[in-house]
Amino acid sequence: NSSVIKSPEAIDSLNIPQIGILPRVEKLKRGFHILQMFIEDGASSFSEAIRSSRAIIESKFEKNKSYMITSSNPSEGKTTYAFNLALSLEKTSKVLFIEADIRRPSVLNGFYQFDRQILGLGEIISGSANLNDAIFKVPGTELDIITSGEKRFDMSDIVSKDQIKK
């Protein structure tokens, strides 16, 4: 497919600021989870790429307080990159990670166990929870997180709500 960007040179030609290129993670070490690779395998090339991204963000984009990671295709590693970057950034800044993929939540898929009911972005938008009830601390870190919440299938009901406009 000629519309897919496959090289750093192709990215450079777009004149869009970039904060890094991640190496493909072919195989995880036994007992490691990709969402915590930055913590669990700090010596990996993946973790080094995350640290480089953090350094670029802190130097080039110091005025920005919000960052969004997105792409047009599923399963490209957006959540993996964003979550590991948040784990890195929380070492030097206060960070709130918001998992906004309400249709396909990843962060909670049995990975973290919280000591209370999970309320998330879906519940905030639907009006069944407020912001403070939906913020969780990631165990073992200072990272705050708002998960997607319960898995949602009827997005049209949620997106049409007045709460999303707020």
Explain the meaning of each model-derived region.
Residues 1-96, 100-122, 128, 137, ...:
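Short boundary/hinge segments that flank catalytic cores
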Residues 128-150:
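Switch I (G2) and immediately adjacent beta-strands of P-loop GTPase domains
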